[in-house]
Every structure is written in structure tokens, then in C-alpha cells.
Amino acid sequence: MAASGKLSTWRLPPLPTIREIIKLLRVQAAKQLSQNFLLDLRLTDKIVRKAGNLTNAYVYEVGPGPGGITRSILNADVAELLVVEKDTRFVPGLQMLSDAAPGKLRIVHGDVLTFKVEKAFSESLKRPWEDDPPDVHIIGNLPFSVSTPLIIKWLENISCRDGPFVYGRTQMTLTFQKEVAERLAANTGSKQRSRLSVMAQYLCNVRHIFTIPGRAFVPKPEVDVGVVHFTPLIQPKIEQPFKLVEKVVQNVFQFRRKYCHRGLRMLFPEAQRLESTGRLLELADVDPTLRPCQPSISHFKSLCDVYRKMCDEDPQLFAYNFREELKQRKSKNEEKEEDDAEN
């Protein structure tokens, strides 16, 4: 672990404020990239503090923008900070920070959705999964447009222990729209409980740490922002392939106002739907009249375990997609109507 019980002694030299840099570079937030800048360094410092002790740690910051959180990370006396920024307009401002912190800041122009962070840091940082988390952290003020696909991608990486998690149980401290943050951390039975809740919590200890009011950002978003901390679990609560778990969970939550059996039926072709759904629920010992927000992680584990056995018995079952079946049926009906019209 990074050294503890020791105050950071390294600090950035005096620099223009983030607001001054934005004016200097004549940069405006790009709406198409869902950009919102956090200029208050008291808040960026708080995000970094909540990430844990970063002294001598290696940090991967996603979407640094004008560099507010970047400054706070550097002031935490990290060993190295890697930033990946898609928008080239921010590179000069980040380069100014790099010049002020020689050897500490590495800037990559790229897309966080495709960047291979598993090759970014030294092999010596890797730790066995069962050990304490490595001295590698992910921190970021995520653009709203990429936050959900990115966390799903990283959750799959956790399941496979690849990507940023080749180093071990890499911790993440990330921002989301408040509503998404609440869903990620929602307890069983709460109104916020969702697909994201289950997918995140079967793999991680998830904490919604604090909320930042929208007025703290420039431009001000229409929503508040939640800061969420993730620590991957040593043992996932569901030990099945990620895609299988995702399919079961998605089906349960696709009809939020119905009983859970309504969504689970869509796992099976129409000809065997009722029988197979009944068998799945009976073997998993799950009440078919639970609402989607009510099943616990252990319920989902049972459903996934039984569904896996059913897929093993019928190798074509996992590939089944009820929307494709509907599409084919609609196409056949249209062809029949055309034939009838011709006759």
C-alpha cells in the first residue's frame, strides 16, 4: 500500500487558476461531449481525499479537462499521474501542469473507452487478487454521456480481472449524475434499485460518498453530481460469466412495474416460455411475484446459477434473443399480408 500516516510534502508551484486557464485557452465546454468543469479546488481536493491515501501511488485520471482534479491529485504527492483526454483543446493547459510537476504527469490524447491502461504502468505494481488493493487508482469526473458504458466496461474488466484490474483490485473514485450514483449504491427494495445496482454490487463494495451541487460546475448541469467509490471484492457474489449475469439482470429489470417473472420469461423462446420460467424460479427458490427492485444479490445468484445449468443443457439457449424472435414474427406477418393482398 502507499505510505500512510504521513502528510504530503510536495505541492505544485503557484499557477494560474483553472478559470484563468480556461479563459487563456478560450475553451468552452463542448455540449456534444457532455463536458462540465469543476473549478472549485476545495471540491476537487475532497474527491481526491475520498479516494484514499495516494502518497506514492499511481493514478489513472479519466477526462481531466482543464485539470482541476489533476491539480488535487498531483498535490497528494503521487508517484505518477496518467491522464487520458479526448479533447485536444485541453492539452496545453495539462502540459502547463506537467511542466510544473516534472516526471509526475503523463498526458495521453485518447479515448478512455478504448485506452489500454493495463499496459500503462509497471508490472511490478501487480498484486494477487486476494491481497490488499494495489497502489493503482482510477479517478475521474466522467462526462455524463460515457459514465454508464464506461462503468459497465470496467465492471466486466473486474469480472475478467483484465484491463485496469490486471494490477489487482484497483480502486475507483468517479463522478456520475446523482441519480446514477444513487442507483449504483441502492439497497435491495429501494426505488433506486436497478440493473446498475446489481451489476456493481455483485462485484464491488460500492459507496456513494457525497453529492456535489450542480451549481459548482461550469456550465451548470441540470442535475447534481454524486461521487462514488468502488473497491472490487475478493470473491464476487455471483460466480458466473459477466455476460450471463448481465442478461439475467437486464431481463428482470426490463419491466420495472411488473413482477420479476414477467422479465425472466423473455429469457426463453415462446414455445417453452411458461414451462422454463416456472422451472427457473422453482429451482432458484425465487418468489415469482417479487418486483424487480426486491430480489437480493443472493436471489440473483440463484437465478444465474440455475439459468447457467439450463444453458448447459440447451447450448442454443444463451444466444436466444426475444427481440429477434419478435422481429422475425413481424417480418413473417408482413410477408403474409403482402401475399394475401396479391391474391
UniProtKB/Swiss-Prot annotation:
GO BP field: rRNA methylation; transcription initiation at mitochondrial promoter
Positions with a binding annotation for S-adenosyl-L-methionine: 38, 63, 85-86, 111-112, 141
UniProt EC number: 2.1.1.-
Domain of life: Eukaryota
This protein's GO CC annotations: mitochondrial matrix
Gene3D superfamilies reported for this sequence: Ribosomal RNA adenine dimethylase-like, domain 2, Vaccinia Virus protein VP39
UniProt key word Methyltransferase: yes
NCBIfam families listed in its UniProt record: ksgA
Protein name (database record): Dimethyladenosine transferase 1, mitochondrial
Species assigned in the record: Pongo abelii
